[in-house]
UniProtKB/Swiss-Prot annotation:
UniProt-recorded name of the protein: Bifunctional protein PyrR
Enzyme class, spelled out: transferase
Quaternary state and interactors: Homodimer and homohexamer; in equilibrium.
Function: Regulates transcriptional attenuation of the pyrimidine nucleotide (pyr) operon by binding in a uridine-dependent manner to specific sites on pyr mRNA. This disrupts an antiterminator hairpin in the RNA and favors formation of a downstream transcription terminator, leading to a reduced expression of downstream genes.
Naturally occurring in which organism (per UniProt): Streptococcus suis (strain 05ZYH33)
Family to which the UniProt record says this protein belongs: Belongs to the purine/pyrimidine phosphoribosyltransferase family. PyrR subfamily.
Amino acid sequence: MKTKEIVDDMTMKRAITRITYEIIERNKNLDNIVLAGIKTRGVFIAKRIQERLKQLEGIDVPLGELDTKPFRDDMKVEDDTTNMTANVNDRDVILVDDVLYTGRTIRAAIDNIVSLGRPARVSLAVLVDRGHRELPIRADYVGKNIPTSRSEEIIVHMAEIDGQDAVLLVEGA
């Protein structure tokens, strides 16, 4: 299998900063936002967006962690490790994930969010959109569009868990 780094740490930082600016531009009331990071790497991306929002706008946006496994249609897991202390009722919830592929993880995340309350709006921010949707889901905020074939895989490395920031393309996975 051939592996190629397609996003380095500086490019990832810029992509997350761009997503943050787009969130600021498209949301009139930043006080109504709740970030919901999808475990595992989506949580780290959401924390970085949260930090940038604080730096740029001086606002402390609530952040929760979503576990999508209990809501997936392709696996049966009982343990739900969701940690969402913020009230999502009538709030603008922004789901945050590392890679958007088939859309099945996002569908599970939406199911999880609506099990917690009734948000005013749910939008989606992803670091990488690689295409190949199986469900009618699209990201509102995208760091990088990286078209792939189905035989390729996108792997996101985050410094918090992997020791470095990078996005890798693995051919023939």
